[in-house]
Design a protein with these regions (language model features):
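Non-heme Fe(II) oxygenase metal-center motifs and adjacent flexible, charged/small-residue loops
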Residues: 1-192
Length: 192
């Protein structure tokens, strides 16, 4: 996992981190980005990644606490087939407010994010859907925020975002003073 791609749009989009995209069929995140955004090149799953994915799917599909929550609230169990690994080298690597509203994830995507390494805060805000396009990417304009929560993502924690969460909330990893590395393994269903 040493061949992470640097997001060369970092100065333009404000997203500073390294990333690697895995997809079971080795598809690009978006075919139109294939030649312009090389950090979205797809890599084939390895055994370790596949085992982590199977464990997450088992927990949300069966009579576990997580599975019971999915059942109680009629949350669709995703057919996870992709994983974006973000590498935050230190506390200065971050991602700006965003949400995952791409057609390639479906109308109401379920996102399962596993944190490994340093503890970081995830900020969640309610939003007014107001976007502008930057190099083909949807970037949130500043909108009215009614809700603002910071969640502590510790080593080994699993964050689930499901239902209409991507429509009504943005999320970001905020900067801090840490000098330690954090990995975020974000599993989801990629449908295109």
């Amino acid at each position: 996992m040493d061949d992470f791609k640097y997001n060369i749009n970092a100065n333009y989009t404000g997203n500073v981190r390294l990333q690697k995209w895995y997809q079971t069929n080795c598809k690009y995140f978006s075919p139109k980005w294939k030649y312009t955004l090389p950090w979205w090149e797809s890599f084939k799953y390895d055994k370790i990644l596949l085992n982590i994915q199977k464990k997450i799917l088992f927990d949300i599909s069966n009579k576990t606490i997580l599975g019971n929550i999915f059942n109680k609230y009629n949350i669709n169990i995703p057919n996870i087939n992709s994983c974006l690994i973000n590498k935050y080298r230190d506390g200065q690597d971050h991602i700006i407010p965003h949400n995952n509203i791409y057609n390639s994830f479906g109308k109401y995507p379920t996102i399962c994010g596993l944190s490994i390494g340093d503890t970081r805060y995830l900020r969640v805000k309610s939003i007014v859907n107001n976007y502008k396009k930057i190099n083909g990417l949807s970037k949130l304009n500043k909108g009215i925020c009614d809700v603002n929560f910071d969640y502590l993502l510790e080593d080994g924690s699993l964050l689930i975002m499901a239902g209409a969460s991507q429509k009504y909330f943005s999320n970001e990893i905020i900067k801090n003073m840490s000098s330690k590395t954090r990995y975020s393994l974000t599993f989801r269903e990629f449908i295109i």
